[in-house]
């Protein structure tokens, strides 16, 4: 029976259940399905399973399926045409009583709150308070089996105005309430910030589902479906609260590889980490910078400058990038997105479009974020693709090396060769750019040098005084028939004063003058802008840089290799490899040098050769300090030979210079090469120390080709004969000075050893200490022998009788003759007698005379006589018939002649 609302309900307890005071609640919550999603229980999400499906709106109020009014307590409704940006304040504990207040919006942008904003957030009610859950009743069980019984009169909630009593010391606490932790300062609070921009439509991207809040499985039947609405009470209201603030997640998973490095293949979830990787691993200048603007027009101008500076071209006004007011934008380089034949440009992409981009991307991007007081822009202006300007992708180490070589005034072909030789040292990680660096063209090197010099002029406080000169590339054929590049200075034409004379009717008018305009009409007072030629002044000196038609490029005058115009390389700064490459290049182009220039090159070559000799000598001195010649290592001797070759080269260089001074028609390199070749030929042909000299002594009589020798008796004798024959046919050479010195050293050591042995006192030789006790004979291992077949002994036979011969028995006469021959042959051989134990005494009746003779002779023979291959084995004489054996039954059994076990 159901009770009235103001009466206490009757509940029947299960056996073993404690009696808990039932508190009547005033607030109607019997439709809500309460779930505690987080461990600390601070977040409560209310789910209307089927009520939300059928919501009827009438007269400005909303009703659910049971006709109850749905009230929205804390959900704010905004006017149509407004954009709402939700921001979350997250408090992070930094330790030592310090906290960081970070505000994050829907798009994922984070910023630190200012001090006055932090104070404002702290003053907001219910934001930063620590909430301790005081629950006096047992934690509710939300399972369907243990759900409370519902009736027509729903239970009423406790009044919120009544003060809560503190928990008693011994009060019961349920398991869920026990593990509930209070709300901390590090948790997140939600702040709604309205930005009214009626021009922009609402275009908010819904947040993705949070994995922490998992929806419960639907029950079999909702509790309100079991109720009857016949005797319905007063109109109840269902309270819908806004969903709890979710943990702010990044828009993309951190483990997802979205941006892939084009060089090594490493993947990163965000572009900032890819730019940082390109700086650290591939030496690229992909620095991420931040700027701030206060107007969208300023941002558009900045975007235009970035695109012009990085891509080298002016975009048209029709396709100029527009800044959308009050929204965030992202511009990326679309080089990886479109065909390689198209030009790269910065294009705007959305959040969804960015997630669908290909993995290999360019690092150039511009990201705009609207803040409270300004527009924040984060950008990277460094491209990593090869097309267009080569300076986009060249690492800083390569640019430094190029500037160093240009500072030394090395020719462009020498720079190409040096970059190819040093590509592996300049690029610590193997990349695709390595092959590009080994095959850089001269045009790309000129372009790179212009980029480097422009960057230096931009960042230097003192402006350089050098000027640019036009250059032209020419290809000549060297003496060896190969094509060699030459960079020549182009003489600029002289400036002529421009007089506005009468134009020649045969020459068509150009775009520099307006059509139908005669400057004599106005006497030159008002010359229109189209007819005036603007002077393009150089950034450095203010002089006009002339770019003629036959010119292939511009280059700094101080960095141009031109020995004919007093622009020689800086020889004191050149390395040995650079000098060798320069010497080969000058030999190919056959450049005319003065005597001073030739002396300078010769001096530098002699300097490097002398430095090599000194270095090798110091190495030899360190290695051979305190050592004799016999203790030198093979590598040390090889170094000694290298040092000798350097000395020979240096002497030939000096000798060639002396000869060229006497005869200017000769070339130093040719004379030096011929001298070195002659020395090498003489060393190969004339070697008196290494080759045996033929003496005038009479020739010895020729030895016979074959001298019969008895066969060797042992393996050692055979080896000795072979070695003697090898020594006999070995060529005898004259002992070198090194061998004589080695022999004297050995004889001296032998003499010192003998003197030491004579003077040293004699000591008794002690027997070697036994490291292990001797093993007794009975414990020693017995060698394994193959077991042989044994003959069954008869009752009257002796144990020492010889084994019977297997096979077909022979006649008695033949056996006796064979035994007599065997005994006669054994008596003729001289055998050393040994002590033999006496055989056991056997009765005369059992052993016949022939058996006695055979046993005695067999014991005297040694083992080697038995195994002599010259003696042919013969069948043993047959044994005499033994006495028959009687069994218990009287049966006579004769022994068998042969028995095989």
Swiss-Prot record:
What are the Basic and acidic residues biased-composition ranges? 846-866
Q: Record keywords: Calcium included?
A: no
**What domain of life does the UniProt record list for this protein's source?**
Eukaryota
Changes seen on gene knockout: Enhances the cell death defect of ced-3(n2427) mutants. Double knockout with the synthetic multivulva (synMuv) class B proteins lin-9, lin-15B, lin-35 or lin-54 results in 100% lethality during the L1 stage of larval development. Double knockout with the synMuv class B protein lin-53 results in slow larval growth.
A GO BP entry: nematode larval development
Task: Write out the entry's keywords from A to Z.
Answer: Apoptosis, Metal-binding, Zinc, Zinc-finger
Which named protein is this? Answer: Modifier of cell death
Protein source organism:
Caenorhabditis elegans
Lineage here is: Eukaryota, Metazoa, Ecdysozoa, Nematoda, Chromadorea
From the UniProt record, report the name of the gene that encodes this protein.
Answer: mcd-1
